[in-house]
């Protein structure tokens, strides 16, 4: 069985603002826990490879199921300390790519051309591009075979402008995902703030916020099984 590639951030701070950020842990662990239940193997990649920092704000929402994955030596090693570099990955090995969030991704996901190429090749091979919350930033600049934005004309979701305001981070991030999706012709679909929501449009599956990671995983598993 082909694997699923989980994309994580290397970003430690909010740009020049010396405040810690990184991966929102539950967005990775809840997703990979569902993959494990379905016997779907995963690999972990980051823009630079290696160390993946954790967003301390996300640790306030850690549950027992999140901890059960976090404590696994395999997860600590392959996801948090020795994630793969893009150059170490063959897109042909994967049936889907999943962009986990955390505010850190706003700095190192959107303009990473290596990750864009990997995602585009998975998509062109019939695979799925998926994301949750801020992870949608990784989809913004992926192009299709004709050079158009992949998200143009597609129904997708991600962390909303309202949620960014409620989080108190609107002035700390370099852009707003909802605005950038719409600039590129994407149809940004949203529900109530901080409520689970996932939407699929063909080979794109996206979740709105941290509480949607499990739903994204389940939707992907269902799509793969068809």
Language model: regions and residue ranges:
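Catalytic nucleophile serine of serine hydrolases
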Residues: 133-135
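Active-site cofactor/cluster-binding pocket
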Residues: 128
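Extended, subdomain-level signal for the structured scaffold at the beginning of enzyme domains
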Residues: 1-125, 137-226
């Amino acid at each position: 069985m082909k694997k699923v590639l989980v994309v994580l951030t290397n970003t430690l701070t909010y740009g020049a603002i010396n405040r810690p950020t990184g991966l929102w842990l539950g967005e990775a662990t809840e997703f990979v826990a569902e993959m494990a239940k379905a016997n779907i193997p995963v690999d972990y990649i980051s823009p630079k490879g290696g160390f993946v920092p954790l967003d301390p704000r996300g640790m306030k929402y850690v549950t027992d199921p999140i901890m059960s994955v976090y404590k696994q030596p395999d997860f600590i090693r392959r996801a948090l300390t020795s994630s793969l570099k893009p150059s170490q990955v063959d897109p042909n090995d994967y049936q889907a790519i999943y962009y986990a969030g955390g505010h850190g991704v706003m700095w190192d996901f959107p303009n990473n051309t290596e990750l864009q190429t990997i995602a585009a090749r998975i998509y062109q091979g019939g695979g799925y591009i998926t994301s949750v919350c801020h992870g949608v930033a990784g989809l913004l600049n992926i192009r299709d075979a004709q050079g158009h934005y992949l998200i143009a004309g597609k129904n997708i979701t991600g962390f909303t402008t309202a949620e960014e305001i409620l989080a108190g981070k609107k002035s700390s991030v370099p852009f707003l995902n909802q605005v950038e999706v719409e600039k590129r012709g994407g149809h940004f679909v949203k529900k109530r703030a901080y409520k689970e929501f996932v939407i699929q449009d063909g080979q794109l599956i996206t979740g709105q916020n941290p509480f949607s990671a499990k739903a994204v995983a389940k939707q992907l598993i269902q799509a793969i099984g068809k």
